[in-house]
Amino acid sequence: MDLSALRVEEVQNVINAMQKILECPICLELIKEPVSTKCDHIFCKFCMLKLLNQKKGPSQCPLCKNDITKRSLQESTRFSQLVEELLKIICAFQLDTGLEYANSYNFAKKENNSPEHLKDEVSIIQSTGYRSRAKRLLQSEPENPSLQETGLSVQVSNLGTVRTLRTKQRIQPQKKSVYIELGSDSSEDTVNKATYCSVGDQELLQITPQGTRDEISLDSAKKAACEFSETDVTNTEHHQPSNNDLNTTEKRATERHPEKYQGSSVSNLHVEPCGTNTHASSLQHENSSLLLTKDRMNVEKAEFCNKNKQPGLARSQHNRWAGSKETCNDRRTPSTEKKVDLNADPLCERNEWNKQKLPCSENPRDTEDVPWITLNSSIQKVNEWFSRSDELLGSDDSHDGGSESNAKVADVLDVLNEVDEYSGSSEKIDLLASDPHEALICKSERVHSKSVESNIEDKIFGKTYRRKASLPSLSHVTENLIIGAFVTEPQIIQERPLTNKLKRKRRATSGLHPEDFIKKADLAVQKTPEMINQGTNQMEQNGQVMNITNSGHENKTKGDSIQNEKNPNPIESLEKESAFKTKAEPISSCISNMELELNIHNSKAPKKNRLRRKSSTRHIHALELVVSRNLSPPNCTELQIDSCSSSEEIKKKKYNQMPVRHSRNLQLMEDKEPATGAKKSNKPNEQTSKRHDSDTFPELKLTNAPGSFTNCSNTSELKEFVNPSLPREEKEEKLETVKVSNNAEDPKDLMLSGERVLQTERSVESSSISLVPGTDYGTQESISLLEVSTLGKAKTEPHKCVSQCAAFENPKGLIHGCSKDTRNDTEGFKYPLGHEVNHSRETSIEMEESELDAQYLQNTFKVSKRQSFALFSNPGNPEEECATFSAHSRSLKKQSPKVTFECEQKEENQGKNESNIKPVQTVNITAGFPVVCQKDKPVDYAKCSIKGGSRFCLSSQFRGNETGLITPNKHGLLQNPYHIPPLFPIKSFVKTKCKKNLLEENFEEHSMSPEREMGNENIPSTVSTISRNNIRENVFKEASSSNINEVGSSTNEVGSSINEVGSSDENIQAELGRNRGPKLNAMLRLGVLQPEVYKQSLPGSNCKHPEIKKQEYEEVVQTVNTDFSPCLISDNLEQPMGSSHASQVCSETPDDLLDDGEIKEDTSFAKNDIKESSAVFSKNVQRGELSRSPSPFTHTHLAQGYRRGAKKLESSEENLSSEDEELPCFQHLLFGKVSNIPSQSTRHSTVATECLSKNTEENLLSLKNSLNDCSNQVILAKTSQEHHLSEETKCSASLFSSQCSELEDLTANTNTQDPFLIGSSKQMRHQSESQGVGLSDKELVSDDEERGTGLEENNQEEQSMDSNLGEAASGCESETSVSEDCSGLSSQSDILTTQQRDTMQDNLIKLQQEMAELEAVLEQHGSQPSNSYPSIISDSSALEDLRNPEQSTSEKAVLTSQKSSEYPISQNPEGLSADKFEVSADSSTSKNKEPGVERSSPSKCPSLDDRWYMHSCSGSLQNRNYPSQEELIKVVDVEEQQLEESGPHDLTETSYLPRQDLEGTPYLESGISLFSDDPESDPSEDRAPESAHVGNIPSSTSALKVPQLKVAESAQSPAAAHTTNTAGYHAMEESVSREKPELTASTERVNKRMSMVVSGLTPEEFMLVYKFARKHHITLTNLITEETTHVVMKTDAEFVCERTLKYFLGIAGGKWVVSYFWVTQSIKEGKMLNEHDFEVRGDVVNGRNHQGPKRARESQDRKIFRGLDICCYGPFTNMPTDQLEWMVQLCGASVVKELSSFTLGTGVHPIVVVQPDAWTEDNGFHAIGQMCEAPVVTREWVLDSVALYQCQELDTYLIPQIPHSHY
C-alpha cells in the first residue's frame, strides 16, 4: 500500500473522527440533508421530519430537549458541504490506499458509483458472457463444470480471456469492477486496466514485461491482466515481484492468471478441477486484482466485493484449489497458500501450480509462508484500520488466527507478506483464512457497493447479478454453475439424490459432503486441506470462510467461521461479514449445495483433488455470483432461480433499501446477512447431517435462487424435513433460517445473526447493539428480535429457536442484528443440539470475547445513542434498542415504542414513499423476527421458532416479496393486494410448512399444535378463509408490516404469515406471544402451547388457565376448523396487526428481551393477565356459553396482544415520553399500522371471537354475533384491558391507565381469583373493582346477567373494563363499539350462517333476559353512579337497546356496517395499515361468516382504534386513572341521564367532557401533549377521552351491542342482518339523532352527506379518520372544497391546533373545525359524536382558546372582510395565492387581482396583502404603496383575522412604504 498501515490508521482515525462529527445523532449516519434546529444542532432532515412527524406540536431536540418545530428547521448548506468534502476525502483515501473505507456512509456512495457502473458493465458483460459461458458450460464436459462454476464455459484460453476481460471490466468500472470481472468473456482489457490502475503501471509493466506475451501489447494494465490470464507463470512471477504495488494487481492478476493459466493449464494439463479452480480463483483474484488495481480504494472495495463474492468462493476455491493443487495435504493452508501462492509467487508457483498443481500447491504454500505473514501483518493493519473505521479488527485477528489455525498460516503469511501490501493479496488472504475480516470488509463494502449495484442490476436484470459469482447472468452461468449448482444442486440437495450431472460432477469434483467435509477435514491429503479448512473453518472462522465455498458444509462452516471471525469485531465483522456473506453466502449456499452434492459425488477419493478443484472453482463462481448478486440483493439470486418470487423479493429488497434512507447498504447487508445467517444455519445443519445440510442448502439455494418459489418448495421440503423429527424441525428451523435469510435476502442477516449470536453469547446486549450499527433499517427490527434472541439466549434452546426465528422473522434486516445473535446462540445452543455446538462454541471461542464485548459495548453505546432518538432512520435502532433492551427490559420497553415508532415512521415514510413497495420487507424482518422470537422464546423456541420461523421465512419471504410490494404494508396496505395473490400461495405454502411446523410444535405444544394445525388445515380447507386470511394476512402484513416495518411490521407480517400459515388461534397466540415478547409468549406459549407449563406459571390461573389453554387450543382448533378459520384469519390479520403493533413494542420490549427471570415474571404476569383475561373471557364465555377454554385462549391471546400493549404501556408508564414514543408507534400502527394495532386487539378479540365463536357456534353464536361485537369486544376490551392490566401490572400494575391502583387490585384480584373461577361476575367485579366504579353494580349486573347476559355482561365487562380501562380501555370500549361497527352486523349478519342465526336467536333471547335483568339492575342502581356505573352503562345500553333495540341495533349495525365499510375503505386506501387492516377486518367480517369471524372483524375495528388507544391509553389511561374514575362517575351520572334521556347522547357528551379532561390529563400525566407531535400521545389523548367515553359509551356501546344482538336477531339471516346493518346506518343516524340530541348536528350531517378533510394528521391517524369516514359514509377528501363540512385538525388535549391552510379555509368557510379526538372518540363510542364538544378552540399562534372556528361557524352571516377589496400581491409561501384569495373571499372580501384594478370610491376599502419574507427583492414590497392608494399589510393580518374570525386592526400589520425616490 502507498501508505503504511500506521499512516492509514491515522488517516482513517481522522476521517472517522470527522465522520462522527458529521453524523446525525439520531440515525448515526452521515448527514445527507443536514438541517439545523434553533438550538444549533444538526440532524438529518429525514430524521428530524420523522421525529417531528411522531408528535404533533413541538417536539424536543434529541440532544438538548429544546422544543423544535418544522418551521424552526433550517437547511445547513455548509454542513452539507462538509459532508460532501468528507465523502470526497474518504473517496480519495480509498483511492490512495486501495482500501475501502469501511463505512456504511461511504458504502452507499461507493456502491452507488461502483456498483452502478459495475452493474451496468457487469450486467451487460455478465449477461452475455455468463450466458454464453453457461451455454458453454452446459456443453462442456464434467471437467468444464469447474469452468462452468467459474462461469468459464470458455476454453482454458477462454477462461484466461474471460478473466482478463473480467479484470478489465472491473478496472473499467473500477469501483464496479467487482461485478465486471465476472462480467464477460471479453473483459481482458478491463482486467488489464483494472490491474494497471491501482497496482500501478510500473509494476504492471514489470509484470507485463515478465509475463507479457500477447497481452503485453495491451496497455500495462491490460498486459498485466492478459499476462495474468495468458502468461500465467510470467504474470504471476511479475506480479510477485510487484507485490507491493502490484500486490493488488499481482494478486488479482495472479488470481486471474492462475485462473487463466490454470484454465490453460487445465486445457493443457486437462486438469479441469485445477483449471476450474484456477479460474474461479482467477475470477476472485481477478476481481480483487482488478478492483484493487483499479484504485486501492476502488479495488479494495471491489476486492471487498470480490471477497464478498469470492471470500466464500475464493476461499472455497482457494481451499479447493489449494487442496487440489496441493494434493490437499494442507487443504486449509493450500487454499490460503494457494491464493497467496498465486499472489506471492504467482508466476512460478502458479506455473508450478498449473503444471504441478498438486505439488506446486504445497510449494506455493511454502513460498507463501513469508508473504502470508507479511500480508497478514499488513492485512492486520488494514483490518485494524478497517476495524477502527468500521469493524474489521476483530475479523482480522480472527482471520489471522484462523489462518494460523489452518495448517499453513505461517507459510501463507510469508507468501502474503510479499503480496500483503496490495489489497488483492489482502483479499486473497481474506479469501484465505488469513484476512477473513478484510475479506469481510471487502465483502461488506462490496456488499454495500454490490448491494446498490445489485439493486440496480436487479432492477435492470431481475436480480441476475445477485449470484454473479461469475457473471451477471447468474441465472445462466449461475445456472450452469449455480443453477447447475444452485438450481440443479438444490434439486439434488432437495432430492438428495445426485440427480443433476452438474451436481454429480460437482459432488464428484468436490467430493465434499457435510459428512465428507468433516471426514475430509480429517483426511490429510487434498481433502484434508480443504476438508480441514471446512472443518477447521467451521471451528475456525478463517478456514470456514474459505471453506464455505468449498461445500455446502463449508458454506455453513464459512458462515459460522465468518461469524466467529467477525465476532472479534462483532459489528464490523458481522456487518462486513454479513455483506461478505450476503454476497458470498448465497452463492456459497448455492456452491455449498453444489458442493454438497459434489461432495456426495466426490466420495471418490482419487478424483477428489480435481473434483475439488472443480468444485472449488464452481463454488468460487457461485460465491462470486452470490457476491456480486447476493451483494446486491440475495433476492437477485433468488430472482434468477425464481424470477417471480425473486422479483418480489428484489422489490422487497429494493424497497427495503429505498425506504431506509441510509440503510440501503445496511439493508442490503442485512438482507445478505440472513444469507450469512442461513449459511451459518446451514453449517449447523450441515454438521448435523449432510442431508440436513443439503436440505438446508437447497432451501438456501432455492431461497437464494427461486426466492419465493424456493421458499415454497424449500418450505415444503423443510416441512418434510422438519416433520420427520424435532432435530429435523430444528434443521428446518435452520433451513428456514437459511431460506428466510436467502429469501428475505438476509443471508447476511442470518449469518450476522449467527455471528452475532456468538457475540450475544459474549454480550447479548452488546451483540444486539453490535448488529444495530451494521443494520440501519432492519436492525431496528432486528434489535427487538436480537434482544429477544438475547433473552432467549439465556434460554439457550428457546433462544436458539428464537435466533433462528429471528433470522426468519427478520430475514430482511432484523436478522442482521438479531438473527446473528440469535444464530450464534442458536448455533451455540441449537447447534450443540444440532450437533454444531463445537462450531458455535468454537466460533465463540474463536472470537475474542474481549473484542466482542468491546465491540458490543461500543455498539451498545451507539445503540443507546440511537435509541435516544428512535426515528425512521434508526433502522438499526430497534436492534440497538433491542440490545439495550436485552440489558434493560424496561429500557427496551421504553425504546421499543421508539423502535416501533421508528419502524412505524419508517414504515410510514416507506409506505408513503413506497407504500406499495418495500416497507413491509423490513417490516417483515422486524416484525417477523420479534414475533417469532417472542413466540418461540417461552415455549417451543426451536419449534415455535422453526415453525414461526418457517412460516416467517415463507411469509416473510413471500411476504417479503409480497411485502416487497407490500413493504409499505403499514402504509402500503395497497401492496398487500399485490401480494395477496402471492400471499395465498405463500400462505398455502406457509400454511403447509407451518402446519408441519405446527404439528411438530404440536408435539411439544400439544394444545398449540392442534390449534395451529387446525388453523393450518382450516386455512387450507377453507380457501375463502385462506384468501381472507391472505387478504387479512396481507392486510395484516400491510398493517403489521406497517406496524413493524416501522418496527414489528416484519414480525407482524411474519406473524401474520405465521398466523395465517398457522391460521390458528394458537398461531396467532404464538405470534402474539412472540410479538408481545417472552413474557406473554412464555405465558401464552406455555399456557397455550404448553398448558402444563402455563399452569405452573399461572398459579392462580393454573387450574383454569391451563385448562382453558388446552381447551382453548382444542376449541380454538375447533374454532379454527369450524368458525376459527375465517375468524382466525381475521384474527390472524387483526392479531398480527395488533401483535405486530404490540409485538413491535413488546418484542422490542422486555417481553423477549427480558431475561428468563424477567420472562418468567412476565409470564407470570401474562399468566395472571391471561388469567384475568381468561376470567374476563371466561366470564364472557360462560355467559355467552362460550367454553372457557376458547375464552381463556382468546383471553390468552387477547392478553398476549394486550399484554404486549400493556408492556408498551409499561414502558409508557415507566417512561411517559417513551410511551409517547410508543404511542406514536401505536398511532403509526393505527394509521400506518392502524390495522396492526387494532389488529392486535382485534386479533385478541378475534381470538376471543374464535373461542367465543366456537361456543357461540354452540350457543353463543347468535349472542356472539350480537355479542361478538359486544361480548367479543367486551372481552376484547376486557381482555385487552386485562392484558393491559397484566402487562401493566407487569409493567406498572396499571393496565387500565385510568385505574393504576385499581389495576393493581384488578390484577391482584384477577390473579387471586382464577379468571375462570372468578367467573364473569367475579371478573366483572374485578373489572368493576379496577374501575372502582360500578363494581358492585357490575357484580350485580354480572351476577344478574352472568347467566343470561353473557353479552350484556360482556358489554358490562367491556364497559366496566372500558370504564376501568376507563380511558385506558376506552379504546377497548370504543373497540367494542368499533367492534360492533366493524363487525358490521351488515357483514357479520351477511356472513351469518344458519347455525349462527339460530345461535343468535338464542343469544337474542338471552340478551332480552339480560336486558330485563339489566333494567332491573339499572332501576336498582340507577341512583348509584359509582356502583351502577358499569351496570348503568350496560344497563343504559341494554335499556337503550331495550328501548330502542331496533334503533340501537340499527345504530350498532350502522356503526358496524359503517365501521366495516370504513375498514374496507381504509383497506381500499390501503396506503395505511389501518386500511389494510380494515380490509382485513372487512374481509374478516365478510369472510368471517361465523360470529367469531364477525366478532373478529368488530374486534378488529375496535382493535384498530381501541388497541391503538389501548396502548396509547395504557400509559395514558394509567394517567387517566383518575380521570377515568371521574369519568366513570360522570359516565355513571351521564348514564343515569342516558337512562333518562336515552343516555347515548349524554353519555357521549359527558363522556366526551371527561374525555377531554382525560385527554388533557392523560397527556399531561403521560408527559405527552397531543400537540407534541406525538401521534401516540395523541391517540393516548384521544383514547383517554375515549376511555372516558368507553366508560360513558358503555351504555351506548352496550346499547349498540345489544342492538347489535338485536340486529343480529332481526338479521338472523345473513341477509337480514345485512339489511339491518345497511338499514342500520340510517337507523343509526336516526337513532343517533334520537338518542343524541346534541349529536343532531353530526347526525344531520350524516344524513346530509358530510365531507371532511384532515390536517396535520399522521398516516395512522388519517387511516383512522378514513375508517371513520367510511363507516359513517362521510366523504374524505384531500383538499377543502365548498362541499367540505368538517376539517379534522390534529390538536392537543385542549383542542389547540397548529395553523394550517385547511384550518384557515375551514374557519373562513364556516366549516366544522374539529379535533381529531372527535373521530377517535366517535370511533370508540361507535357513533358519531357531537362536534361541538370537539371543536377546535384555538391555535398555537393566536391563542389557545380564541374560539375562532366556533365564531366563524356561527357567524357566517357576518363576514369579517365584508366591504374590503383585498389584493393578494406578490409571492406567498406555504399557500397558493388563489387559496389566500379564496380565504378572503370566504370571509366576505372582494378579491382584486392587480393593484391597478382597485376601484376608488366610497365604501370601498382597498388593502394590499403581501408576505415580505417571500420577496426576493428586499424593498420591492415597500414600493407597492406607490402603485396604489391602499394600505399594505402582511399576510399575517389575513391569517390572524381568519383564525380569530375577527377583523384585526391594520396598524399592527402595516408595512411602511418607501417613497419611490428612495426605492
Curated annotation (Swiss-Prot):
<feature type="modified residue" description="Phosphoserine">
    <location>
        <position position="1423"/>
    </location>
</feature>
<dbReference type="GO" id="GO:0007095">
    <property type="term" value="P:mitotic G2 DNA damage checkpoint signaling"/>
</dbReference>
<keyword id="KW-0677">Repeat</keyword>
<feature type="domain" description="BRCT 1">
    <location>
        <begin position="1642"/>
        <end position="1736"/>
    </location>
</feature>
<comment type="subunit">
    <text>Heterodimer with BARD1. Part of the BRCA1-associated genome surveillance complex (BASC), which contains BRCA1, MSH2, MSH6, MLH1, ATM, BLM, PMS2 and the MRE11-RAD50-NBN protein (MRN) complex. This association could be a dynamic process changing throughout the cell cycle and within subnuclear domains. Component of the BRCA1-A complex, at least composed of BRCA1, BARD1, UIMC1/RAP80, ABRAXAS1, BRCC3/BRCC36, BABAM2 and BABAM1/NBA1. Interacts (via the BRCT domains) with ABRAXAS1 (phosphorylated form); this is important for recruitment to sites of DNA damage.</text>
</comment>
<feature type="cross-link" description="Glycyl lysine isopeptide (Lys-Gly) (interchain with G-Cter in SUMO2)">
    <location>
        <position position="109"/>
    </location>
</feature>
<dbReference type="GO" id="GO:0051865">
    <property type="term" value="P:protein autoubiquitination"/>
</dbReference>
<feature type="zinc finger region" description="RING-type">
    <location>
        <begin position="24"/>
        <end position="65"/>
    </location>
</feature>
<feature type="region of interest" description="Disordered">
    <location>
        <begin position="1181"/>
        <end position="1216"/>
    </location>
</feature>
<dbReference type="GO" id="GO:0000724">
    <property type="term" value="P:double-strand break repair via homologous recombination"/>
</dbReference>
<dbReference type="GO" id="GO:0007549">
    <property type="term" value="P:sex-chromosome dosage compensation"/>
</dbReference>
<feature type="modified residue" description="Phosphoserine">
    <location>
        <position position="753"/>
    </location>
</feature>
<feature type="modified residue" description="Phosphoserine">
    <location>
        <position position="1211"/>
    </location>
</feature>
<keyword id="KW-1017">Isopeptide bond</keyword>
<keyword id="KW-0805">Transcription regulation</keyword>
<dbReference type="GO" id="GO:0043009">
    <property type="term" value="P:chordate embryonic development"/>
</dbReference>
<feature type="modified residue" description="Phosphoserine">
    <location>
        <position position="1342"/>
    </location>
</feature>
<dbReference type="GO" id="GO:0003677">
    <property type="term" value="F:DNA binding"/>
</dbReference>
<dbReference type="InterPro" id="IPR011364">
    <property type="entry name" value="BRCA1"/>
</dbReference>
<feature type="cross-link" description="Glycyl lysine isopeptide (Lys-Gly) (interchain with G-Cter in SUMO2)">
    <location>
        <position position="918"/>
    </location>
</feature>
<dbReference type="GO" id="GO:0070063">
    <property type="term" value="F:RNA polymerase binding"/>
</dbReference>
<feature type="modified residue" description="Phosphoserine">
    <location>
        <position position="1524"/>
    </location>
</feature>
<dbReference type="Pfam" id="PF00097">
    <property type="entry name" value="zf-C3HC4"/>
</dbReference>
<keyword id="KW-0833">Ubl conjugation pathway</keyword>
<dbReference type="GO" id="GO:0005694">
    <property type="term" value="C:chromosome"/>
</dbReference>
<feature type="cross-link" description="Glycyl lysine isopeptide (Lys-Gly) (interchain with G-Cter in SUMO2)">
    <location>
        <position position="987"/>
    </location>
</feature>
<feature type="modified residue" description="Phosphoserine">
    <location>
        <position position="1328"/>
    </location>
</feature>
<dbReference type="InterPro" id="IPR017907">
    <property type="entry name" value="Znf_RING_CS"/>
</dbReference>
<keyword id="KW-0963">Cytoplasm</keyword>
<dbReference type="GO" id="GO:0006357">
    <property type="term" value="P:regulation of transcription by RNA polymerase II"/>
</dbReference>
<keyword id="KW-0808">Transferase</keyword>
<feature type="modified residue" description="Phosphoserine">
    <location>
        <position position="551"/>
    </location>
</feature>
<dbReference type="Pfam" id="PF12820">
    <property type="entry name" value="BRCT_assoc"/>
</dbReference>
<feature type="modified residue" description="Phosphoserine">
    <location>
        <position position="114"/>
    </location>
</feature>
<dbReference type="InterPro" id="IPR018957">
    <property type="entry name" value="Znf_C3HC4_RING-type"/>
</dbReference>
<feature type="compositionally biased region" description="Polar residues">
    <location>
        <begin position="705"/>
        <end position="716"/>
    </location>
</feature>
<feature type="compositionally biased region" description="Polar residues">
    <location>
        <begin position="1445"/>
        <end position="1470"/>
    </location>
</feature>
<feature type="modified residue" description="N-acetylmethionine">
    <location>
        <position position="1"/>
    </location>
</feature>
<keyword id="KW-0131">Cell cycle</keyword>
<feature type="modified residue" description="Phosphoserine">
    <location>
        <position position="1457"/>
    </location>
</feature>
<dbReference type="GO" id="GO:0070531">
    <property type="term" value="C:BRCA1-A complex"/>
</dbReference>
<dbReference type="InterPro" id="IPR001357">
    <property type="entry name" value="BRCT_dom"/>
</dbReference>
